[in-house]
């Protein structure tokens, strides 16, 4: 089965640069401690790397 990623917003985007805010929103995260599920692909991994200090990532098998 394909791997998926559970991405949780753990830190606020208040006071962060606009590009980081846009990246968090593009991942589908709106509120603190919200978790979204995405397929594991290079585009999503790149977005995670850009805001790694704001999110927590867990790999899940489905």
Curated annotation (Swiss-Prot):
One Pfam family per UniProt: Ribosomal_L30
Segments passing through the bilayer: none
GO molecular function, a single term: structural constituent of ribosome
GO biological process, one term: translation
Keywords: Ribonucleoprotein, Ribosomal protein
Any GO CC annotation of this UniProt entry: cytosolic large ribosomal subunit
Gene3D superfamilies per the UniProt record, alphabetical: Ribosomal protein L30, ferredoxin-like fold domain
Family according to the record: Belongs to the universal ribosomal protein uL30 family.
Subunit (UniProt): Part of the 50S ribosomal subunit.
Annotated protein name in UniProt: Large ribosomal subunit protein uL30
